Amino acid sequence: MRDIQDFDSLMIRLASPDTIRAWSYGEVKKPETINYRTLRPERDGLFCERIFGTTKEWECFCGKFKSIRYKGVICDRCGVEVTHFKVRRERMGHIELAAPVSHIWYYRSVPSRMGLLLNLQVAALRSVLYYEKYIVIDANDTDLEPMQLLTEDEYRDAHERYGAAFTAGMGAGAIKTLLQNINLDELAAQLRAKMIEKGAKSDQRLLRRIEIVENFRASGNKPEWMILDVIPVIPPDLRPMVQLDGGRFATSDLNDLYRRVIHRNSRLSKLMELKAPDIIIRNEKRMLQEAVDALFDNSKRKKAIKGASNRPLKSISDLLKGKQGRFRQNLLGKRVDYSGRSVIVVGPELKLWQCGLPTKMALELFKPFIMKKLVQKEVVSNIKKAKLLVEQEAAEVFAVLDEVVSEHPVLLNRAPTLHRLGIQAFEPVLVEGKAIRLHPLVCKAFNADFDGDQMAIHVPLTQAAQMECWTLMLSARNLLDPANGKTIVFPTQDMVLGLYYLTKERALPEGKKERLYSSVPEVLMAAECHAVGWQEPVLIDYETEPGKIETVRTTPGRILFNEEMPEGVPFTNYALNDKKIRKLIENVFKDKGPWLAVQLLDKLKAVGYKYATYFGATLSMEDMIIPPEKAGMLEKANKEVLEIYNQYKGGHITQEERYNRVVDVWQKTNSNLKEILMKRLQEDKGGFNTIHMMETSGARGSKDQINQLAGMRGLMSKPTGDIIELPIRSNFKEGLNVMEFFISTNGARKGLTDTALKTSDAGYLTRRLVDIAQNVVVNEEDCGTINGIEYAAIKRGDEIRESLSERIAGKYTLERVIHPITGELLIDVNEYITDETAKKIEEAGVETVKLRTVLTCESKHGVCVKCYGRDLARNRIVRIGEAVGIIAAQSIGQPGTQLTMRTFHEGGTASKNVEENRIVFNDYSIIVRGIKGSYVTLKNGHFLFTRKGEFTFSRVLNEYALKKGETALVSTGTRVVKGNPLYTLKNGKEVLSENIAIAEVRDNIIYLTGQEQTIEIRNGSEVVVKENDVIKAGETVGTFDPFADPILAEYDGFVRFEDILPGTTLKEEADEETGVVEKRISDAHFDKMQPRIFISDESGNTVGEDSYFLPGGAQLLVEEGQEIKAGAILAKIAKESVKTKDITGGLPRVSELLEARRPKSPAVLAAIAGVVTIKKGLLKGKRTIMVRDEYGHDVKHLVPIGKRMLVRDGDTVKAGEPLCDGSFDPHDILNILGENALQNYLMKEIKEVYDAQGVTINDKHVGIIVRQMLRKVKIVSVGDTKFIFDQQIDKYRFHEENKRVKEEGGQPAVARPMFQGITKAALNIDSFISAASFQETTKVLTNAAIAGSSDELRGLKENVIIGHLIPAGTGMKQYRDIKLFDKNKSDLDIQMNEILERRRLEAEAAQALEEKELIEEENFLDDL
């Protein structure tokens, strides 16, 4: 027989009345539950033993049959079957209804399924079901319409006029008849014809109707089954009744709801038998309908039925829904046996793979194992005595305990478990006390500290589970963070300080030379005798690499450090701060393997703690040195602020500009003070100032925090995020005055509230991500795709944020990579790129590499090995069965909580990058290649840009000035790689290139330049250089106003206003403080008028074709008729005042991107590339912009009024370029630029939020989530497929159907990709079990039942819910069905038969023995 657990899919359907009767073991006729005197169930009641099975094991109700030997006998007196009481959990009953009722899920949920089928509005359907109106079922030859609603009076009139010529009815019965009359095939054909006829004008309702009809047709469900003639009664042990102390009963709410239904049902039957008046019966039927509604879904009703304590009763739907529902409370999260929890304390003496387990806990957790061992060792004779011994905590027990615990791993978990490293396995070491001891290095992964955190402990029981713990989950095997592949186990805080102190070097006093020592023992002895300081530089002959001895300049501390390290760790001769320690661990891990890395970590921990203790760092007020320059700097800043205020008073600048400039001054002052303070601390005590050491080593504190202690606290922000322009000039050492203290309360409080609120947000984000990606598992070696994405280094301006080698390592190539100069093959197609190959490719000067990525993977379910590439947590190629979807979701969700919790350490100080007012390249020289755009040439030869332009340049990597007699070997335009000769010296020796570059030779100087780059030049910028100039580092290229965006005239002439009318579109306000009149454009009348400026010549003719549109809020700076020169400022728009960026901006931003929300006021993007024409006049209150492409096609774009235009007449735009300001709408990017552009945009945006917080997340994690969001397509043209216009369909199903149609010679369908938010995508997932356990449970189940959905159980979640092993790792089908076979088959068969026969005999013997014991026991009881 197949095991009940052995099934591959699960189907859900509507139950027909016959099915419900077939499930049932009898009809429940009475509302009684149990007899209050005997406390036994009432016959035919809700707990009846005849229907649901006996309450006493192997005994009937009346007691006639009492024994297992009567198993299966049905008692002739009471009718109860002799069986086990557990059947009361599975046997169902039913209630035969006196009148049909509607199922609330199918008529009440939105959209109403019944309403769609019958094409009735919900209100109309309700009025029929609740017996308020009649509905015409059959109109025959009357002038009534079928499905017409009639009130009581209208029905009477019709009856008098037509008599029995028509049929009408009310209630569920009438609806049932209508549903029975539907011919689904005909209806489907009619609706499809209507859809084709309407075409693009068809509405959503029509699409929904077709979908529901098709679902009914495909599933074999009948529409009339949505009306119930009989309702099932769930087994009594699932709605129990429990006696409390004091004789009262606690009962499940379902019993109350069932009782109401039975009451009303029997009353209705009686009334119908008595032939009561119609109105009474109708009322009773309505009440029955309400009672059944409440039973199925009490929360959907307007007035929920309340129980005794005036709380709404929990109906069947409520038992499934929400966090406390069956799905999330009992199926996805169960309480686990063999577990305990306790407070954690630090265990510095432990090895990395150990944890300290309190003896008391171990006794309880390993109880069964101890008992077994005691019996095995013959300490006791049976299990009962062993149990007693354990409970008494006898000495023998402790002797056995050590044996049991050793080499039996345990799992430790710290809530919240945000990523997979929140649960790790350790080898337990017994400790005294009641606290669990945790190794200090694993705290980072658990995010644990020892301020009272608790951890849970679990014991893996089976051999397979223990094996998994040792091989996969052991802490020593999880050194890397799955989110980015960097180490997550590394020393922090005290350990870092200890290591930094030990390896730091003190400067020698002037005139003193390093002493020379011959051997390691000599140096260490000298240091211990204080002949030389631990940090003093010395010279020593030392073995830096195996077999290589050289004289090195180092310190005794570093020698000691290297001696302590395990063999194989490279010689380390520098001061170790946190970053360098991590680098050292990473290098050892990569070069020497994980085992040496684990030994290294334990050594680092020991040495770090030891020398931190010897150092004994303390903080003193003396260590906080307030720079003497502070007073002068504040004085200077005050003067600057006063000057800005005077400019404002004179009306030269606006209020916003004044505010922005003041904030800017204080920001600069603060950052300058910080730099000086850091310098002072560094010079103090020869670099051994404790605060300075803590900060530089990375042990504790940041530059900003130290600045608040000894510099100045700086600017604070209001709760709204605006910066308060009054800075806090004091620091904590000087103390704040009352005003300053009051200002800082804002930030401090905001940090704490944010933390509390945002933690739940991050948790919810993780939950949504897991739900969408949980079924993505690596399930094949190669999907065979020919698509991929081009990767290049990520640059911000000119600084490389992520190098090419970092980005491509660990992925597979899609195309060959050829050396750009030598033409040799660096790596072939479909090859894995190792770290070494990646470096080689980068050094060869390759700019871009086309790779396979998860985004372009074509695996039908999950992803393939070659598109995924490296498993970051293990630093090797991913294995089939890895649950990469969950890892991706955790990698994005887990830092989310850190993002939220980051705010409160800073205490709300405002931080913003100081905006420069010039274009400058500080770190390198450049050669100007081109200046493009619309500009006016000024008298001094500078270019003033009247619109945005482009500045193209090449970076100078090296320059070589040739002296007399030296000859260049390259000419302008030569490509050189590392090692190519550049020029010869006088002596004929060649100088070689150190870079990959392009050479340029001018005036006897060889410049090696990088690739050409382009930056955007802002409107209003003045560029002071010309093409082909060589600009030295730090020289100004151009200047601009960072606080305002000007509108500039492009021609000489006279100003002419249009639609600029004082009082309507022009507001004139006198500033109260300064008395200066400010003229601003108001956007109140933009629907009728468009304020703009023309420039005309003396005779009044317009010069040029352009007019200058003025957006709302612009400040007007010219008068009508005023004569102006090209480049004059006509108006300017102040930039928004800057708010502090808090991660609050971060998390909601990630949420917004992942939910695919359309931004509030999105930018309008150009649909095609071409030339812009702005049309006069308005269309529907919007401005019309035409873009004409090179073939003469025009595309119309509508821009809302009041939006700031980014283009003008005659501008050339690229497809996807914004025409007005606003944020990008991802849906527009998808429609205009396609899937790859959208993926790149989302990747960039999401990673930017995390980068701002210093969190790195690998592309592939974001890629998996984005791929899941792009799984659906929308049908644009149906062709000969079964699809419906506008239907949303899974990409792979779409391709399959098209393939089928093409093979049959038909016309395939056309679809456009859809971008769904994570919540929506999770609800539209193929598995209805997973979707129902996520959100909107009833809606998902309703739809699934109608469609007769089958869940293939592919994902992890649905398998957890039904209690299967998850299809990932060793639980995958291909691993579970492995069969071992012997080459000599005949022997195997004989062996198998012998084993089976032996097992059968053993089972029979055991059963016989059990029955014999039971009978003996019963006979003994009978004798008694």
From Swiss-Prot:
Gene3D superfamilies: 1.10.132.30, 1.10.150.390, 1.10.1790.20, 1.10.40.90, 2.40.40.20, 2.40.50.100, RNA polymerase II, clamp domain (4.10.860.120), RNA polymerase Rpb1, domain 3 (1.10.274.100). It catalyses: RNA(n) + a ribonucleoside 5'-triphosphate = RNA(n+1) + diphosphate. Keywords: DNA-directed RNA polymerase, Magnesium, Metal-binding, Nucleotidyltransferase, Transcription, Transferase, Zinc. The keyword Ligase does not apply. InterPro entries: DNA-dir_RpoC_beta_prime, DNA-dir_RpoC_beta_prime_bact, RNA_pol_asu, RNA_pol_N, RNA_pol_Rpb1_1, RNA_pol_Rpb1_3, RNA_pol_Rpb1_3_sf, RNA_pol_Rpb1_4. SUPFAM superfamilies: beta and beta-prime subunits of DNA dependent RNA-polymerase (SSF64484). It comes from the Bacteria. GO terms for cellular component: DNA-directed RNA polymerase complex. Zn(2+) 2 binds at C783, C857, C864, C867. Zn(2+) 1 binds at C60, C62, C75, C78. This is DNA-directed RNA polymerase subunit beta'. It comes from Treponema denticola (strain ATCC 35405 / DSM 14222 / CIP 103919 / JCM 8153 / KCTC 15104). The lineage of its organism: Bacteria, Pseudomonadati, Spirochaetota, Spirochaetia, Spirochaetales. The gene is rpoC.
